[in-house]
């Protein structure tokens, strides 16, 4: 029963992240929601699966996958956001703090 809590947590984060991707106004806020959805949701699901499975070999593979996702997903999201910004996609905010630092 306890192993279902991380699964439920992961599913809820995935649901609310998908809702944010649909509802948010621009690419940056949508990317933020998608990143949280991917990182948090997948981590919860993988942790829940690692608690359910009985094989140590499969648990080890799941933990390696979890570490890989935790390292790679923020870098990919940053690259997408930077590419969108350099490509001229303007954020729908009143003050662009990034433009002040990088003229």
UniProtKB/Swiss-Prot annotation:
Which Pfam families does the record associate with it? PhaG_MnhG_YufB (PF03334)
Q: Which InterPro entries match?
A: PhaG_MnhG_YufB
Task: Name any one GO molecular function.
Answer: sodium:proton antiporter activity
Family the UniProt entry places it in: Belongs to the UPF0091 family.
In its UniProt entry, what is this protein called?
UPF0091 protein PH0944
